Amino acid sequence: MNLTQYLQHISQNNHSPESVNMTLTAWIDILGATMLGRAPQFADTYREKHLSNGISGLRELMGCDDRVMYLISEIACLEALKNDGMLSDIDLCDHVKSLAHQIDLTEPSLDQPVATPPIITADGQIDTRQLTNTTTDAFRFAARIYLCSLVPGFDRHQPQVMELLNKLTHCLESIPAGPDGFDRSLVWVYLIGGSVATSGSLFMRFFKSRCSALGEAGACGSFGRMTRILGILWGKREDGWEGGWRDVMEGNSWDFLLI
C-alpha cells in the first residue's frame, strides 16, 4: 500500500467521494504542470486558497501540507512566465525571493520539539501525523530546489543547492523503505532532488540503496519511469552533458506524469 492509498484508507470516513476526486485533481494539476513547465489549470484557485488559508485536503489524502502544494503551484506559474520571456532577470529574482519567504512561513514553529519522532512507533505502528509532517518536509525541500533552479545562472554545484539536497536526503532517510514503504509516493520529490544531484553525492548513494530495497517494485509505474530518466540524465552528465530531466524526456519522446 503506497502513501496515498494508506492515507485515503484511514481518512475515508472523513471525505466524500467528490472531495476526494477534487483533491486528486488538484494534486495532478499542480505536479503535472511542473512536468511541462507551465501554470496549473486551476492556479488562480490555489492562489486564492493560499491567501485565505483555504484547505483542499491535500495533506490528509496525499501527505503534503496544502500550503506547500499551493506554493509549488506558484513556482510552476513563475517558471511559465520565465519560459515565455515575460520577466526580466531582476523581476524573476524578486519573485524567487518572495516565494522563498513564503516557503519559510510554512516551516514548523520554533516552539515545536527539535527532535523528530520516528514514523514507525515502538509497537510497530505508523505515526500518521509524523508521516505527513516528514512528507511535507520532503516536498518543501524539493520545492526550494525547484525554485532555486529558476534563478538566472543556476548551478547545481552551488553550496546552497548541495546543502538543500543533503537536507532532503536526510529527510527521506526517515521515510519507511522497501515494497511496504512510501518511496513510490515521493516520485516528484526524488525527480527534483535527482535532477541536481552530482556524481558521488550522498543523494545518489541513498537513492540507489532505496531502489535496491524496492526490488522489482522499483522498476514499475511512475517510480520506475523516474529512475530511467535519472539514470539517463546522470549517465549523460558523466560525459559532460549539461541538459536537464525534461531534455531527457523530450529526447526520448516521453510525456510521463511523474507523481
Regions found by a protein language model. Name each.
Residues 2-5, 238-239:
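Secondary-structure junction/capping motif
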Residues 9-16, 38-187, 192-211, 215-216:
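Cytosolic regulatory protein-protein interaction regions
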Residues 16-23, 120-127, 225-234:
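TPR/TPR-like alpha-solenoid helical repeat scaffolds
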Residues 25, 36, 62-66, 72, ...:
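A cross-taxonomic marker for long C-terminal extensions/tails that follow the last structured domain
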Residues 25, 56, 239:
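Noncatalytic carbohydrate-binding groove/subsite architecture in carbohydrate-active enzymes
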Residues 200, 209-259:
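Intrinsically disordered, low-complexity regulatory regions with latent secondary structure
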